[in-house]
Swiss-Prot record:
Species in which this protein is naturally found: Clostridium botulinum (strain Hall / ATCC 3502 / NCTC 13319 / Type A)
Cystine pairs: none
Gene Ontology annotations for the cellular component aspect, listed alphabetically: cytosol; small ribosomal subunit
Protein name: Small ribosomal subunit protein uS13
UniProt-listed Gene3D superfamilies: 1.10.8.50, 30s ribosomal protein s13, domain 2
Ranges for region Disordered: 93-123
Family: Belongs to the universal ribosomal protein uS13 family.
Quaternary structure and partners: Part of the 30S ribosomal subunit. Forms a loose heterodimer with protein S19. Forms two bridges to the 50S subunit in the 70S ribosome.
Pfam families the record matches: Ribosomal_S13
Gene Ontology BP terms: translation
Keyword set includes Calcium: no
UniProt key word rRNA-binding: yes
Length: 123
C-alpha cells in the first residue's frame, strides 16, 4: 500500500487521481509530480513499485507543501490578517465573506442560520 505524507492512497485508483487525496495536491500538481518522477499516470496505485513510491514520496517532501504544513501556513496567514486589522482580517473576525460578495440577502453559509430579532409588539 502506498503511503505518502501520512495518507494511504486508494489502491484501485490511477496514481494521478490517487495523489489528489493528499491535502494540497490537486490534479495539475499530481501531473507535475508524475512527470518529474517519470511515473506513468495511468498506473494503478496497487501496481506501483517500491522505487516509484519512494520517488514520488521524495519529490512531494522536497517540493510540495502538503497536509499539516499547508494547513498551518493558511491558519497563520489568516491570523496575520486579523492581527494587522486589514479589511480582510476584519471580515474573517466577523465571520463574513472575505472576497467582496454581497451580504444583504445571501452569505448564509458564512453568517450561519438566521437569528430571529424580537420586534415591538403591537397592541
Amino acid at each position: 500500500m502506498a503511503r505518502i505524507s501520512g495518507i494511504d492512497l486508494p489502491k484501485e485508483k490511477r496514481v494521478e487521481i490517487g495523489l489528489t487525496y493528499i491535502y494540497g495536491i490537486g490534479l495539475p500538481t499530481s501531473q507535475e509530480i508524475l512527470k518529474a518522477t517519470g511515473v506513468n499516470p495511468d498506473t494503478r496505485v496497487k501496481d506501483l513499485s517500491e522505487e516509484e513510491v519512494n520517488a514520488i514520496r521524495d519529490y512531494v517532501n522536497k517540493n510540495v507543501k502538503v497536509e499539516g504544513d499547508l494547513r498551518r501556513e493558511i491558519k497563520l496567514n489568516i491570523k496575520r490578517l486579523v492581527e494587522i486589522g486589514s479589511y480582510r482580517g476584519i471580515r474573517h473576525r466577523r465571520n463574513l465573506p472575505v472576497r467582496g460578495q454581497k451580504t444583504k440577502t445571501n452569505a448564509r453559509t458564512r453568517k450561519g442560520p438566521k437569528r430571529a430579532i424580537g420586534g415591538k409588539k403591537k397592541k
